[in-house]
Each structure stands twice: as C-alpha cells, then as structure tokens.
C-alpha cells in the first residue's frame, strides 16, 4: 500500500497545512527529547556505526527496545517506540523502511550531534542543550513571555520565585551538571582553531566566565606556550577538572579581571544588558596591555530576518532564549558590538571569522 498523501495543489491548502503543522509544533521537540533520554538515538547510531556491510543498520522497534540502556518493562514499548520513530522519520532524523510489512529504522547522519552517552569526542553533543532547553524549569519560563511583554519583568524570575537564572542553577546540582555540558562547544572550538590564528603570540590568555575550563583546555592543547587563566565564580569552578597550563581563579568579572595579553569572552556578553557588558569590557580594558585584545565569540544577528537562512533562525531563536532566561540578555548585531566596544574604550572592533553560528570578534585598544 502506497503513501496516503493528500492532494494539495492550491495555495490555500498549502497555507492551511502549514498552519496545522505549526499548531502541532510542540510534538517534535518533546518526542525528540524523549528519544534522546531513552537512548534511542544512541542505539540507532551505534547500530549504523558498527554495521560494516550496511545490511543490518535498520532495526525493528523490538530490536531497539531490547538494546536500550534501561530495558522497558512495558510490553507496549515496541509499539510506542514505533510511533515515536515514525515521527522522527517524518522530520528526517531517522530513516524508515518497510520490510515484510513492518517498519524498520536507521540513524541519519544528524544523529551523531545528539548522542547522550556515546559522544563523538571530535564533535561534542547537543543532547544536553536540548534536554536543558526543554526542562520543566525552562518550559515554565516560556509561559511568562506574554506577561513580560505586557507588564515587564524577567520571565525566568517570574516563573521561579524571583530567582535569577545563575542563582537558580547554583542551587540545583542536577541542572548545573546539565548546563555545564550543554552546547556544541567541541565542534565549534575545533573549527575556530582551524580558521582563527589570533591566539598565536599570546602568552597569557584569560577566559572570563570560562566555566569548567574546557575552552582553555582546547586552546592550550594547540598552543602549549599559552598560560591559561580560567576565571569564574567559585560555584562555577566546583566541577572544573585540571587542564595542562590552565589555572582556575575565582572572582567576579564585575569587580576586576586577571591581567593577560588577551582576554576571551565566549558566549558571555549575550547574557547581560548593554550597561553590564560595558562594565565587563571596561574591566577587561584595565587588565590588558596597550597592545592587548579582547576575543569575543558570539552569535551576530543579521539586520534583516530571512526565512531562508538557517543562521537567521539560530540567531533569533537564541535571542528569544536570552529574553526569557536572563534580565537584559540578548544577541546583538554588528552595529551594536561596534558601539559597545567604542563605549568601553576599544576603538577597533574587527569581525575576524566565523565557525558554524559563532563569530570571532577582536576588540583592541589601538585603532
């Protein structure tokens, strides 16, 4: 029996179908999150990776069920997995074939970006970021967006008893561990180190807001002559492992910043208001020599919203994430970064290169 595809043909029908899809848009991310947490994505990825002949990569829902890290006690699990997987297949996350009247599934290449346990060390994973984004704590925050528009305030605080995001995370060990694992950092950093040569000649590199220090770990592994100072709040450093040539230093970037030849701000400025960013940058200015520089790594929003451009989608998605999670946090345009740099004492703001969705921006004291 073939696919039952409704005849569209006219513009009104196409628009109506697009509207119906939008009305049901919550289903895909929540189902995908469950598939990651269950280990379905890892299971399919491993089957495809270990299949030399290409003949056994496709698995039935029953075969997937028995390979999951936690074996289901529910006898209906294979049928439920089938329903989950056919939705993922409709979004091109997995491949689906029908063999002997039964659906079988295989991982698509994009699955390697969403592994939970068998993470590709050359790539990193976005699984934790997706899980955090769809955590109840953050879902409740989205429910306050309308009220923020009408009445003001901060969505995260309104939904979480007035607490700020980073205060909340410091008190929630589960969320803190997930938060520190989030993102696509490995792949992005590897790409940046391929295309950006600005770390050459740096002797002391300070990573302000460096978290657990993984960014400096990557940089110093390529540039072993660099002494790295990983600078963050005490609570952020509690889970920080040891890295060669990296010293963990606790402090507050709004008070002062350790001295270095160069200062790195990776995904820090988007957390704060323009006024707070200028305070941070002025402290960086004080900590740098005359020929020093700040290396900013951030999303840069395009001036126009283009529905055909995935970078626009990512930039504006992240901007709304900042709006709901933080007080005054936002993604910024080129013009906004140039103005912010000038207001903080940096006459030169150079957009050097990009890697995936992040730009590398150099701010220097000398024009």
UniProtKB/Swiss-Prot annotation:
One of its GO terms (biological process) is methylation. The keyword Signal does not apply. S-adenosyl-L-homocysteine binds at residues 209, 232, 252-253, 266. It is an enzyme of class 2 (transferase). The active site is at 270 (proton acceptor). Keywords: Methyltransferase, S-adenosyl-L-methionine, Transferase. Its EC number is 2.1.1.-. Belongs to the class I-like SAM-binding methyltransferase superfamily. Cation-independent O-methyltransferase family. This is Indole glucosinolate O-methyltransferase 5. The lineage of its organism: Eukaryota, Viridiplantae, Streptophyta, Embryophyta, Tracheophyta. The gene is IGMT5.
